[in-house]
């Protein structure tokens, strides 16, 4: 670059720094690329699929899927993991349906969880913006986008047409939120529902999410959560097998998948994942229906092996460490211990 151009650029940069603050614009080579911090999800498989050990901090996340697929359960696990690392969390319960007892069973510190049950969509998103701007909240969960009903629709008569009102509300809110959450390093998770496209013909999926296209665009990570099977013991349902696909990922390669057990009343089964990954990595031996680790017989059948690991946390921790070492990601949190390192 010649001297005249350099002087003009320097003058422009100084003017921008003076007007908008130092660091408004930087040359990429002058600044070390910052490491993306993450919040573990409570599932080792999903942490691996996300590529950075969890959901990224300072970003907008969308978790969507059919009803009763495990979306809220997954977000409650993320809240619990964030709290374990000293984070402050807020839950915007637009559906007015949070089960506090269930959240506590999943490890959420409900005594220190901030909760709001807004009356309409504008109020909910205003609350999200205000607490995000404070810089004191590490994680905000909005449950759900479908329940963010615009005030005009609530105050209107039944049958009134409000075409595109919610989509415009979401678009306006996300334009403001994106910069705020990045600057304050706050993660915002929107839970969303699936709807069928009206008049869908030909190619492509007939499914879509509520609230327009803005959330798809502004989200750094989108997780598609689906129930694949019902887990039974003695013909009694005890949980669901859940598959999560990383439909969009701006911080690591997308389209990876993870499967895990979600047990009724307990949430994501850590023991089930230890068995699955232990067998896959040849840490746990599987002979017929029997599972064993070193000299220890874990049990006959997957459910019995899970029960053994639950009753013997020392062996579960040892298998956890072996999986961690085999994967080679030291920062990965498998749920065995709290990570007390370097959190601001």
UniProtKB/Swiss-Prot annotation:
A Pfam family recorded for this sequence: RecA_C
Record-level Gene Ontology MF annotations: ATP binding; ATP hydrolysis activity; ATP-dependent DNA damage sensor activity; damaged DNA binding; single-stranded DNA binding
One biological process term in Gene Ontology: DNA recombination
InterPro entries the UniProt entry points to: AAA+_ATPase, DNA_recomb/repair_RecA, DNA_recomb/repair_RecA_CS, P-loop_NTPase, RecA-like_C, RecA-like_N, RecA_ATP-bd, RecA_C_sf
Species of provenance: Campylobacter lari (strain RM2100 / D67 / ATCC BAA-1060)
UniProt similarity note: Belongs to the RecA family.
Annotated GO CC locations: cytosol
Subcellular location(s) per record: Cytoplasm
PROSITE patterns: RECA_1 (PS00321), RECA_2 (PS50162), RECA_3 (PS50163)
Residues annotated to bind ATP: 65-72
Stated name of the protein: Protein RecA
Presence of the UniProt keyword DNA repair in the record: yes
Keywords: ATP-binding, Cytoplasm, DNA damage, DNA recombination, DNA repair, DNA-binding, Nucleotide-binding, SOS response
Keyword check for Lipid biosynthesis: no
Stated role: Can catalyze the hydrolysis of ATP in the presence of single-stranded DNA, the ATP-dependent uptake of single-stranded DNA by duplex DNA, and the ATP-dependent hybridization of homologous single-stranded DNAs. It interacts with LexA causing its activation and leading to its autocatalytic cleavage.
């Amino acid at each position: 670059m010649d001297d005249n151009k350099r002087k003009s650029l320097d003058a422009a940069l100084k003017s921008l720094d003076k007007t908008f603050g130092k660091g408004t614009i930087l040359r990429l080579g002058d600044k070390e690329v910052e490491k993306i911090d993450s919040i573990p999800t409570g599932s080792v498989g999903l942490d691996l699929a996300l590529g950075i050990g969890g959901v990224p901090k300072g970003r907008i996340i969308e978790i969507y899927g059919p009803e009763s697929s495990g979306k809220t359960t997954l977000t409650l696990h993320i809240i619990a993991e964030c709290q374990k690392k000293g984070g402050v969390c807020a839950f915007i319960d637009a559906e007015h349906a949070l089960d506090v007892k269930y959240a506590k069973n999943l490890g959420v510190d409900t005594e220190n969880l901030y909760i709001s049950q807004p009356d309409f969509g504008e109020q909910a998103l205003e609350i999200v913006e205000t607490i995000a701007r404070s810089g004191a909240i590490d994680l905000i969960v909005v449950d759900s986008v479908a329940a963010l009903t615009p005030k005009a629709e609530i105050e209107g008569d039944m049958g009134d047409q409000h075409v595109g009102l919610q989509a415009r509300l979401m678009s306006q809110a996300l334009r403001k939120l994106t910069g705020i959450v990045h600057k304050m390093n706050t993660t915002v998770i929107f839970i969303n529902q699936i709807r069928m496209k009206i008049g869908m013909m030909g190619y492509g999926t007939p499914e879509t999410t509520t609230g327009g296209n803005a959330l798809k665009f502004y989200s750094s990570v989108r997780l598609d959560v689906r129930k694949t099977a019902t887990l039974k013991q003695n013909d009694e349902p005890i949980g669901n097998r859940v598959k999560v696909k990383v439909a969009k990922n701006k911080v690591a390669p997308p389209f990876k998948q993870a499967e895990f057990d979600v047990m009724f009343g307990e949430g994501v089964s850590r023991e089930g994942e230890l068995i699955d990954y232990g067998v896959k990595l040849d840490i746990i031996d599987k002979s017929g229906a029997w599972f064993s680790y070193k000299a220890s017989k874990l049990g006959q059948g997957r459910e019995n092996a899970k029960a053994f690991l639950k009753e013997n946390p020392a062996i579960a921790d040892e298998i956890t460490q072996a999986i961690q070492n085999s994967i080679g990601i030291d920062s990965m949190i498998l749920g065995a211990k709290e990570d007390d390192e370097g959190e601001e």
